[in-house]
Amino acid sequence: MKRMHECLDHMDEGIGRVSEIFPDLPVQEVVLTRLLLLVGGTLLGELESKLKPYGLNDSDFRTLMMIYSSPTGSATPTELCEYAQQGATNMTRIANVLVKGGLITRATSAEDRRRVVLSITTAGKRLVRKILPPLFPNVHGAFASLSAADKRTLDRLLRQIAVNIDTLTQPDAGP
């Protein structure tokens, strides 16, 4: 990939040309959207490259982390679909990968035999403890030029955008 500043210049020039053709183009919002996608895509690519040696991708790891971080060390596929923003078919694939890797178990719920519960294994916990610390330097580095106040502001703004998008895509979802 070209250096990021070259990508940003190219993006700005392209959006400028499109805005000449479409005068009503919401330029600032388009720029912000492209920036979010560019930054998110870059972060995702870096994460995926770190996870690949472990046979995991972002959605696998995110799911494993959700189970790892739950108070009980377990979750239902339905809960995971909702919070990991995955469809049922992909969640089945993810669960199969994690079960096959010995990172989680799949069992029937003791409270409701119709429900399946996915629980993290000792091997899953061990893998999380192995994978996470080497990710910290890149996470710190991505935000190194931001002050603590900048980070709080960015957090607040991104959360507002997330709620706005949720409202647009699911009109019955209010704040």
Stretches found by the model and what they are:
Residues 27, 37, 41-87, 169-175:
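N-terminal helix-turn-helix DNA-binding core of bacterial DNA-binding proteins
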